[in-house]
Regions:
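Conserved small/polar residues in nucleotide/adenosyl-binding loops
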Residues: 454-461
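Cytosolic juxtamembrane regulatory segments of multi-pass membrane proteins
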Residues: 209, 434-441
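Gly/Ser/Thr-rich beta-alpha loop segments that engage phosphate groups in nucleotides
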Residues: 184, 243, 330-336, 460
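Alpha-helical transmembrane segments and their membrane-interface boundaries
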Residues: 256-407, 411-425, 429, 433, ...
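Hydrophobic packing positions in regular secondary-structure scaffolds
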Residues: 1-270
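Membrane-interface junctions
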Residues: 17, 44, 56, 80, ...
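Mid-bilayer segments of alpha-helical transmembrane spans in multi-pass integral membrane proteins
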Residues: 106, 121, 402-403, 407, ...
């Protein structure tokens, strides 16, 4: 692990001294991932100067680790022939992603300049959504027939893997029409007799991905089965490519990032994470505004609730002091519940079949926590205002609101799931609005009842 900022400062010193030979040696000595971190901290002109000092193979490795906007920027700034060679050195799926982020004219120009076989394979990948198995797969994999012997397979691997630069994870077995029949691990090959036929040792119980599977499905399958790669098939079970574990990790990271954004009411949709962080102000507004309208409408309803109980506020202005306390604690426990359920639904630990059990469980937990904090708030208010009745009202409201918040926080994601709406996107704004509206209504209703009872007792005493 290197200190990125210290390294960047050193690079700038070397650039200032114009000792490029020394800098070239140092840059090529870094791991591609570290080099990508360094490049993200450099200014555009510094990036270009440093990039021209890196070997082409190292440059291609580093490009994979850069965010899309920087990939396009760097390749657009360097010589076109050099950029084409670097793209050719990328894995097919990475090349498809990079070219897909460019302007259409630039994409076509590069595809026309690349070797025909490579260009055709990349074009095919670009036909698929980059977040599906078709867009993430690589067409480079090892395939054999079931009638081959172990010795024939091993000889074939030695020849083919080096020739096509294939990263070898598993060997796949197909028929003459490319239908996927089975899979072989390297361990099985190395521990079997040379004369054994593939059909006798292959695993026909295949875990596979469909070409249209989205990244959440891909991540779930990899997490469940822990394979280094998975085959990708079309609707006719033709083997089309493989998705490797590192690509699945990238998909999982993107999925997690999207869920985090969604839980805050940021609708990514077709907008990339990099566009939200580094793109135009309008792009960021477009991602963040939609669900704020839901919150706006909900809070206007909450304002109307306060207005309905205006007479209570005038008679007991002190109740307004406790509104932030009630809203804050109810909001927090609601957020806790919603986070647990949304994450559980995402990972498969929670299913819609267990909905009732989780609703009852979270509601009970919310009630218990609410009762605990309700007692604390009652005692605090009694000690502070010397008014037990007021403290009791605030405490009861606290217990009810926290139980309601936990219930809403649990019920909302399940409801969204049933309606085929992403629970992560909608749940945050919905629960915030619902908790505020219902919480205020419960609180003011209790306060009004307390005020009415107080007035009734006062009249009886006067009479």
């Amino acid at each position: 692990m290197i200190d990125i900022q210290t390294t960047v400062d050193r690079i700038r010193e070397i650039l200032a001294d114009e000792t490029t030979a020394q800098l070239a040696e140092e840059l090529n000595g870094f791991h591609a991932a570290d080099l990508a971190d360094i490049f993200q901290e450099l200014k555009p002109e510094e990036r270009l100067e440093c990039f021209n000092l890196i070997d082409e193979d190292k440059a291609a490795e580093m490009i994979e680790y850069l965010p899309p906007n920087l990939q396009v920027e760097i390749l657009g700034d360097i010589d076109t022939d050099l950029a084409a060679r670097i793209i050719q050195n990328l894995p097919h799926d990475a090349a498809a992603d990079v070219l897909g982020d460019m302007e259409e004219d630039d994409t076509e120009a590069y595809l026309d300049s690349l070797p025909k076989k490579f260009s055709a394979e990349v074009r095919e990948l670009m036909n698929y959504d980059e977040d599906t198995a078709g867009g993430m797969m690589t067409p480079l994999f090892m395939v054999v027939t079931q009638e081959m012997t172990v010795k024939e397979v091993l000889d074939y691997i030695r020849e083919k893997a080096e020739e096509d630069n294939i990263d070898l994870y598993y060997v796949y077995v197909t028929d003459t029409q490319d239908h996927l029949l089975g899979v072989l691990s390297l361990r099985t090959l190395l521990t079997s007799s040379f004369k054994t036929k593939v059909k006798d040792i292959m695993n026909a119980d295949i875990v596979k991905l469909h070409i249209d599977d989205y990244r959440d499905t891909i991540s779930d399958v990899f997490m469940k089965y822990q394979f280094d790669s998975l085959p990708v098939v079309d609707q006719y079970n033709h083997l089309r490519g493989i998705v490797t574990w590192d690509d699945a990790q990238d998909a999982l990271e993107e999925e997690t990032t999207e869920e985090i954004y969604a839980s805050s009411g940021i609708s990514t949709g077709s907008i990339d994470e990099d566009e939200i962080l580094e793109g135009s102000v309008f792009t960021s507004m477009k991602a963040r505004t939609p669900w704020l309208f839901v919150t706006l409408i909900g809070e206007l309803i909450a304002v109307n609730v306060v207005n309905i109980f205006d007479h209570t506020l005038k008679a007991l202005p002190i109740v307004a002091i406790f509104i932030p306390l009630l809203a804050g604690l109810a909001g927090n426990i609601g957020t806790q519940s919603i986070t647990l359920i949304v994450r559980g639904l995402s990972t498969g630990q929670i299913t819609t079949g267990s909905m009732v059990r989780h609703i009852l469980r979270e509601s009970f937990i919310g009630l218990m926590i609410g009762a605990f904090f309700g007692v604390l708030v009652t005692l605090f208010t009694w000690g502070w205002q010397h008014n037990f009745e007021l403290g009791f009202i605030v405490g009861i409201a606290m217990a009810i609101n926290m139980a309601l918040a936990a219930l809403i926080g649990t019920l909302t994601p399940f409801s969204m799931k049933k309606l085929n709406i992403d629970p992560a996107v909608a749940s945050g704004p919905v629960i915030a609005t619902a908790i505020d509206v219902l919480g205020l209504a419960v609180y003011f209703l209790l306060a009004s009842m307390f005020r009415s009872e107080e007035r009734r007792v006062g009249k009886e005493c006067r009479s």
